[in-house]
């Protein structure tokens, strides 16, 4: 039987869209990886870049949601002292973690070998470096010990490199710059346990975007305002958490002393 001919770049993009419509995201990833690997030193188009991002986001998102649910059940069973069940849950969680690691390793390898080196426009550089930070952050969510430390350090390096370009080259209202600020602040809050830094970063990004709202382009208005809303929601949540923590520290601390700042 004759081997099917290799699909062209356009055909792979079409097949990725088809897979997206059918919600077959693993196959969508495969089609977009082929596109990324066939362009060599050429940049992906904005459409191709977004398709790749959507494919991976769905594939990783399903596993991250599974991991959170299983971890929550594990905590409940631990608190009840059900050791036998905890052992079963840990094994099952490990299976999900293997899948998460494989997905993250796949996109990180593609970013390092093709996507970051071939990017020339500031927008695409920030997009891919942010993506690199995101997938190292996803690793840091479930890894422990040295692996977690390494993942967190790699997240920081990628986000900082993206931030440097974004602040210099992209307007404060640009959805990619705002998305970077959103994810970087989440990293500070969730992975580094630095709520003050998380709030500072989110507030600065939000305030700068608000001050330049008039310059927001028609095509990015919806994306930008949505991310700004998410930044504001996080700020509301985080500042209330900080206030509660501070109140607890004041209650517990000896008179004349305050709790340590982050």
UniProtKB/Swiss-Prot annotation:
<dbReference type="InterPro" id="IPR023410">
    <property type="entry name" value="14-3-3_domain"/>
</dbReference>
<dbReference type="Pfam" id="PF00244">
    <property type="entry name" value="14-3-3"/>
</dbReference>
<dbReference type="InterPro" id="IPR000308">
    <property type="entry name" value="14-3-3"/>
</dbReference>
<dbReference type="InterPro" id="IPR036815">
    <property type="entry name" value="14-3-3_dom_sf"/>
</dbReference>
<protein>
    <recommendedName>
        <fullName>14-3-3-like protein B</fullName>
    </recommendedName>
</protein>
<dbReference type="InterPro" id="IPR023409">
    <property type="entry name" value="14-3-3_CS"/>
</dbReference>
<comment type="similarity">
    <text>Belongs to the 14-3-3 family.</text>
</comment>
């Amino acid at each position: 039987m004759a081997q099917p001919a290799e699909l062209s770049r356009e055909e792979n993009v079409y097949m990725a869209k088809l897979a997206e419509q059918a919600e077959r995201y693993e196959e969508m990833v495969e089609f977009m990886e082929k596109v990324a690997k066939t362009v060599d030193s050429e940049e992906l188009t904005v459409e191709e870049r977004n398709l790749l991002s959507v494919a991976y986001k769905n594939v990783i998102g399903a596993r991250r949601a599974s991991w959170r649910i299983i971890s929550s059940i594990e905590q409940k069973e631990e608190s009840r002292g059900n050791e036998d069940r905890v052992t079963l849950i840990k094994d099952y969680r490990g299976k999900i973690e293997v899948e998460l690691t494989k997905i993250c390793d796949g996109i990180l390898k593609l970013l390092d070998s093709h996507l970051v080196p071939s990017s020339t426009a500031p927008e695409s550089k920030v997009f891919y470096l942010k993506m690199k930070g995101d997938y190292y952050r996803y690793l840091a969510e479930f890894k422990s010990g040295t692996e977690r430390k390494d993942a967190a350090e790699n997240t920081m390096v990628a986000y900082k490199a993206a931030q440097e370009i974004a602040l210099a080259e992209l307007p404060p209202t640009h959805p990619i710059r705002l998305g970077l600020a959103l994810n970087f602040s989440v990293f500070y809050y969730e992975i580094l346990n630095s709520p003050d830094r998380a709030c500072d970063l989110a507030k600065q990004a939000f305030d700068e975007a608000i001050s330049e709202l008039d310059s927001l382009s028609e095509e990015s208005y919806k994306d930008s305002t949505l991310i700004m809303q998410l930044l504001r929601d996080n700020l509301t949540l985080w500042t209330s958490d900080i206030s509660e923590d501070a109140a607890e520290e004041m209650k517990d601390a000896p008179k004349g002393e305050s709790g340590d700042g982050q």
